[in-house]
Amino acid sequence: MRYLVISDIHANLEAYDTVIAEARRLGYDKVLVLGDLVGYGADPNAICERVRDLKADGLIRGNHDKVGSGVESPEGFNAVARNAIRWTYDNLSSENRDWLAALPEGPMIVDDMIEICHGTPFDEDAYVFDDLDALRAMHAARRPLCLFGHTHVQVGHCLSRDQFGLASADDTRPLSIALEEPNRYLVNPGSVGQPRDGDPRAGFGIVDTTAREVTIYRVEYPIAKAQARIVQEGLPDVLAQRLALGR
């Protein structure tokens, strides 16, 4: 089985369409979506409709989905994020707002191997920023492979009986991680719509349960078009500028 794994789309239609096209070229059987479909970007309705059409086998909410649909207040968001999420709420159709509001909270068990969450298995809004965060998340996970998002950074953590390892993606080739028993893994496929690791290309992952391997990819997309849409909709200019920086 090959699972396409996408996270943190953030209403970036140009990035999303490019990722799906590349994933179809690579081949996949099922889809897992790790949350934050909306926020920051200019096309929340189109993204909701496209993701709904995917008929994902695993789909959970992110913090921007909660606030953008009115489930929670934007308390804790910075000024730019608050501006964008209020615009998102105002511009979402009632159908898409209700659909987002009904998305389930993570973590979610997918199968005997895979669990998904937005932030961590113990708190959907918590971040994995360092080794201690990663260790705590892996100990809380109920499956050998836990897929997470929220940080917008591609990374893979491995915990074996005698050591803890970290694998980071670079800009030259996809990062593949062999899934060996009885190790535990915590993998972030990166952000589709707003990468924050210095690489502006859209990120995604594919888990092959037969080959017991997870691979995380990057793909170039028409950033200028996404930037133009943000400016066109009157969202903060910084949200357009950061797409070219990958920050």
What residues fall within each predicted segment?
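Active-site-proximal beta-strand elements of phosphoester/diester hydrolases
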Residues: 2-10, 113-120, 186-190
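Active-site environment of divalent metal-dependent phosphoester hydrolases
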Residues: 10-15, 39-41, 64-69, 108-109, ...
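His/acidic metal-ligating clusters that form di-metal
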Residues: 26-27, 91-159, 247
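Acidic, His/Gly-rich catalytic cores of divalent-metal-dependent hydrolytic chemistry
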Residues: 161-247
